[in-house]
Amino acid sequence: MRWSLCCHINVRIAYTICGIIIGLFWACVYIFAWKNWVALAACLTATAFAFETFYFYLSVKRDTILNWKSQTFQVLFWINLIVGFLSIGGMITAIVLAATKHQGVSNKDQHGLNWWSTATWFLVMLKWTWQNAFIARYYGKLLTKSIIHPEEPDDPSTWKF
């Protein structure tokens, strides 16, 4: 049995859909209940990268991901890696701002601008972007390998018993 990145592709798709739903739910909370626009922006950006992950997994399930161009994987890898590093910087900045402004995490403290929520969504963004970078790198290498060394036809004389 071959080891996979996590588990069956349907489980990965379901996990990603849950992440998208949670992101959209919290976006509604930030809009209608807490009016935290900075956390909303970070939340929606992280959710957009979750949609990218969903598209990756859907392409894997449909077996169309290796039809993509090699440059597509390189561009996606670098964009996701750079945004991941930026989200680390955003998370550290948000934590420092939350600590220096003595913000809390209670329901009452969440109304208006709260940097703890923003830091959390920068962490979520880091998860999705680096996961996407890993997937893009993996399938980019797989595509390059399949172009350079196409699969040989199965020759019974080479079988080992």
UniProtKB/Swiss-Prot annotation:
Positions of disulphide bridges: none
GO biological process, one term: heme transport
Localization in the cell: Membrane
InterPro entries for the chain: HRG
Alphabetized UniProt keyword annotations: Membrane, Transmembrane, Transmembrane helix, Transport
Membrane topology note: Multi-pass membrane protein
Gene Ontology CC entries for this record: lysosomal membrane; plasma membrane
Keyword Transport: yes
Transmembrane stretches, start-end: 13-33, 38-58, 75-95, 115-135
GO molecular function: heme binding; heme transmembrane transporter activity
Record flagged with keyword Coiled coil: no
Induction of its expression: Constitutively expressed. Not regulated by heme level.
Function: Heme transporter.
Family: Belongs to the HRG family.
PANTHER family, A to Z: HEME TRANSPORTER HRG-6, HEME TRANSPORTER HRG1
Designated name of the protein: Heme transporter hrg-6
Annotated source species: Caenorhabditis elegans
